[in-house]
Regions:
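Noncatalytic partner-interaction/assembly domains of nucleic-acid and motor enzyme complexes
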Residues: 1-89
């Protein structure tokens, strides 16, 4: 009898957080990351939401920082879904 083996995709939550942090700290890194990384590359759902918000700010030519990111997430009613302001900080 063949057993079904569920395999998790390789992921590193800390690496995901580091990429998002770099995007919030250095606006020059946003364009570079967006060239290489897509939302579906993130494993953690909250990281997907944050990445999408950062991408949206960048596309609108709004400087990405913690304040603008929190504001954007609040506008989209997604801040609490990702863990609130404490998770962003």
């Amino acid at each position: 009898m063949a057993e079904s083996i569920e395999r998790m995709l390789p992921n590193d939550i800390n690496a995901e957080a580091a990429v998002l942090s770099a995007m919030m700290i250095d606006n020059n890194s946003v364009a570079k990351v967006l060239e290489l990384v897509r939302e579906n590359h993130f494993y953690k759902n909250s990281h997907k939401v944050i990445f999408r918000a950062i991408s949206d700010l960048f596309e609108r030519n709004i400087e990405v920082d913690i304040i603008t990111l929190i504001h954007r997430l609040e506008e989209k009613s997604e801040l609490e879904k990702i863990g609130g302001k404490l998770y962003i900080n």
